[in-house]
Swiss-Prot record:
Residues 663-682 bind DNA. It comes from the Bacteria. This is Formate hydrogenlyase transcriptional activator. InterPro entries: AAA+_ATPase, GAF, GAF-like_dom_sf, Homeodomain-like_sf, P-loop_NTPase, Sigma_54_int, Sigma_54_int_dom_ATP-bd_1, Sigma_54_int_dom_CS.
Length: 692
């Protein structure tokens, strides 16, 4: 069948039709105008436009029913396999009645898009030799169109083809323009957020900046960054809630990872978008969203923060309003999450570098302090006495464990040396032992030294400082004079021992540490507990494995060895050549009480080395006495002039029938400790059993 484009509409009629159709802004309006024109000209009762999208293989349908109701529909199944598919393969006019239509396209007839009609006609829409759809006309009566009417329908179709193509081009141009504008705006947002977050190297500041930018651009009210904690199976949550536009609430907490939505994202490494309901099985900290926002929260979006193949954490966004997480917004939020991941990676790296730098500085200071003090400490354990042998057996027994050790003994007995021996024999010997003296230090300064502080934590805290517990991570911490620790600081020490965690002064961040504690004191902690000067729970926690160091007076057989070792060490340090010590000097030193113990002995030897001329050690006897007046048994018991120590002890033992201890024993009468008397009896060769 041939068509006459101009038909007999007349120039004016054709112009009016063309002008009317060209004025339509979109395809739905074009379909409605076409229906009115064909209805007014009695050519059809309704008209529609079917467009074919070759790229997506979908069909779009625009029509107006006889009752004036507009219809818009698209799919890639029923409609796409209807009459438009036929017109694409055979570009001739397609016409049929409803019965034929139903037999040919039963699914389309049953879809409700086409109410029962009399006759149907579909003409191809073409532009530049390309068919891109069809223009359909429907009559309610079963009466085919005459040849003259087909001419007019074809004329309408030609005009509709031109107009539809223009509308499509305009729509596509608008879509492209909108896309360009959106991409430009998205790029600006990305640049703004990237510049804002990449300059933040502190995690708290970074989270605050991320929340501010996301809230500003997306109006999202609840923003969190979730990172894995140093503690196993724990999460650190940094949250910001915009309950008040001008005063957002910032929170930080640590929660269990098990059973959380974040755990699902860590496993899948994929975005998770869910509609929230208060009845959903949520983890306790996720249910807190409802405590904060009531039932306003609608949607939760969790975006993985990836650095290469490593997942650093999760960006978690909760929104009260619907339709915030659109496809376009989610695409942009994914890109933002990539930038945030870079910033988080940088901040964590900076945090680690800063921590290692501070640790290195503190280690250098501590090492310098240790080197400065090394000359005043004996460099190795010296002693062959049974008392020292028992101590060393205990050291060897406990060293390989991580148990807390409490070293007890008088001042100057070598408690730090024993602590160092325990550390060197332990599995932690690869790292330097950290030490801290608790005596004569104010509580605030001691707390800062032990646990560290943040910048601005107190007046004068101009920089962050790492404490001894943090410095001793994976190593041993020696707390000397622990009995002098202020009572108000003891609970914090107890918490570290029990939980292996603490906070720096001025911070609420929990720091995990793996420290083996070795404590020492010259005080009677049991008595201090009874006098409420020391916490009983801390005492029990420290007293896991006590080691009692004997005073020097109870191991006189070790004194000659110590004198020789100190003499040669000090002489070498002073550039002297002393290779001989008189036996009388050794006997004199061995007979002394040494209330200052090994430290006092070392000081006496150092003075002797200074005064020595030649290579034989010269001890100034008038400056020291073999038995000090306040500890001499003669002061309390001797009433016979000229009675020496040996004779006095023999006499008192005979009078007490060989009883040493107790209120009526020899030690009590002589004014000595039981252990001191036994030590002297051993030195003088006195057997109490032979005297009884």
């Amino acid at each position: 069948m041939s068509y006459t484009p101009m038909s007999d509409l007349g120039q004016q009629g054709l112009f009016d039709i063309t002008r009317t159709l060209l004025q339509q802004p979109d395809l739905a309006s074009l379909s409605e105008a076409l229906s009115q024109l064909v209805k007014r000209s009695a050519l059809a009762d309704s008209a529609g436009i079917v467009l074919w999208q070759a790229q997506s293989q979908r069909a779009q349908y625009y029509a107006t029913r006889e009752n004036g109701r507009p219809v818009e529909y698209e799919d890639e199944t029923v409609l796409a396999h209807g009459p438009v598919r036929r017109i694409l393969s055979r570009p001739d006019a397609l016409h049929c009645n409803f019965h034929e239509f139903t037999e040919t396209w039963p699914q389309l007839a049953a879809s409700g898009l086409y109410p029962e009609f009399g006759h149907y006609c579909l003409l191809p829409l073409a532009a530049e030799g390309r068919i891109f759809g069809g223009c359909e006309f429907i009559r309610q009566e079963d009466r085919p169109w005459s040849e003259k009417e087909y001419d007019r329908l074809h004329t309408f179709t030609q005009i509709v083809g031109v107009v539809a193509e223009q509308i499509q081009n305009r729509v596509n141009n608008n879509v492209d323009y909108d896309l360009l504008c959106r991409e430009r705006d998205n790029f600006r947002i990305l640049v703004a957020i990237t510049n804002a977050v990449l300059s933040r190297l502190d995690i708290d500041e970074l989270v605050s900046e991320v929340a501010k930018e996301i809230h500003h651009y997306f109006n999202i009210d609840a923003i969190s960054i979730v990172l894995r904690s140093h503690r196993k199976n724990k999460l650190n949550i940094y949250s910001t809630h915009y309950l008040d536009e001008h005063h957002p609430a910032h929170e930080q907490s640590e929660v269990d990872e098990a059973g959380t939505l974040t755990e699902r994202v860590f496993k899948s490494k994929e975005m998770l978008l869910i509609n929230l309901n208060e009845r959903d099985p949520l983890a306790p900290y996720e249910r807190m969203l409802f405590d904060t926002w009531g039932n306003q929260i609608q949607t939760l979006c969790l975006l993985p923060l990836m650095s290469g193949k490593t997942m650093l954490g999760v960006l978690k966004l909760a929104q009260c309003e619907e339709k915030v997480f659109t496809t376009a917004n989610l695409k942009l939020l994914r890109q933002i999450a990539e930038r945030v991941a870079i910033a988080v990676d940088n901040a964590l790296a900076y945090q680690e570098i800063h921590r290692l730098k501070e640790r290195l500085v503190d280690e250098n200071l501590a090492l310098t302090e240790q080197l400065n003090n090394v000359d005043s400490e004996f460099g190795e354990i010296i002693g062959r006495s049974e008392a020292m042998y028992n101590v060393l057996k205990q050291v060897e027994m406990v060293a390989q464990s991580d148990s807390t050790v409490l070293i007890l003994g008088e001042t100057g007995t070598g408690k730090e040396l024993i602590a160092r021996a325990i550390h060197n024999l332990s599995g932690r010997s690869g790292r330097r032992m950290v030490k801290m003296n608790c005596a004569a230090m104010p509580a605030g300064l001691l707390e800062s030294d032990l646990f560290g502080h943040e910048r601005g934590a107190f007046t004068g805290a101009s920089a962050q400082r790492i404490g001894r517990f943090e410095l001793a991570d994976k190593s041993s911490l020696f707390l000397d004079e622990v009995g002098d620790m202020p009572l108000e600081l003891q609970p914090k020490l107890l918490r570290v021992l029990q939980e292996q965690e603490f906070e720096r002064l001025g911070s609420n961040k929990l720091i995990q540490t793996d420290v083996r504690l070795i404590a020492a004191t010259n005080r009677d902690l049991k008595k201090m507990v009874a006098d409420r000067e020391f916490r009983n729970d801390l005492y029990y926690r420290l007293n896991v494995f006590p080691i009692q160091l004997p005073p020097l007076r109870e191991r006189p057989e070790d004194i000659p060895l110590l004198v020789k070792a100190f003499t040669f060490k000090i002489a070498r340090r002073m550039g002297r050549n002393i290779d001989s010590i008189p036996a009388e000097t050794l006997r004199t030193l061995s007979s002394m009480e040494w209330p200052g113990n090994v430290r006092e002995l070392e000081n006496v030897v150092e003075r002797a080395v200074l005064l020595t001329r030649g290579n034989v050690l010269q001890l100034s006897l008038p400056d020291i006495t073999a038995v000090t007046p306040d500890t001499s048994p003669v002061a309390t018991e001797s009433d016979k002039e000229g009675e020496d120590e040996y004779q006095l002890i023999i006499r008192v033992l005979k009078e007490t029938n060989g009883v040493v201890a107790g209120p009526k024993g020899a030690a009590q009468r002589l004014g000595l400790k039981r252990t001191t008397l036994l030590s002297r009896m051993k030195r003088l060769g006195i057997d109490k059993d032979a005297l009884a």
